[in-house]
Amino acid sequence: MKAQDLRTKSVEELNAELVNLLGEQFKLRMQTATGQLQQTHQAKQVRRDIARVKTVLTEKAGE
């Protein structure tokens, strides 16, 4: 997910994306805690996607 793609979305779409990513992050954390997560890079990727969405939301709030 690129920030440029996120900038074209509306605030409602960004909030929905943020909720989805937070749910995904929770699932990944539970898998990590139980030792089931094989692809550990996914946690880092989701964390950075959350940061990208929050950054774009902050930019849109300033407009």
Swiss-Prot record:
This protein's GO cellular component annotations are: cytosolic large ribosomal subunit
Keywords, ordered alphabetically: Ribonucleoprotein, Ribosomal protein
UniProt GO BP = translation
What's one Pfam family the UniProt record gives for this protein? Ribosomal_L29
Q: Which GO terms describe its molecular function?
A: structural constituent of ribosome
Under the heading CDD domains, the entry gives: Ribosomal_L29_HIP
Output the HAMAP family linked to this UniProt entry. Answer: Ribosomal_uL29
The family this protein is said to belong to: Belongs to the universal ribosomal protein uL29 family.
NCBIfam families per record? L29 (TIGR00012)
Q: Which PANTHER family match?
A: 60S RIBOSOMAL PROTEIN L35/50S RIBOSOMAL PROTEIN L29, LARGE RIBOSOMAL SUBUNIT PROTEIN UL29C
Spell out the protein name for this chain: Large ribosomal subunit protein uL29
- What is the source species? Haemophilus influenzae (strain ATCC 51907 / DSM 11121 / KW20 / Rd)
Q: What is the lineage of its organism?
A: Bacteria, Pseudomonadati, Pseudomonadota, Gammaproteobacteria, Pasteurellales
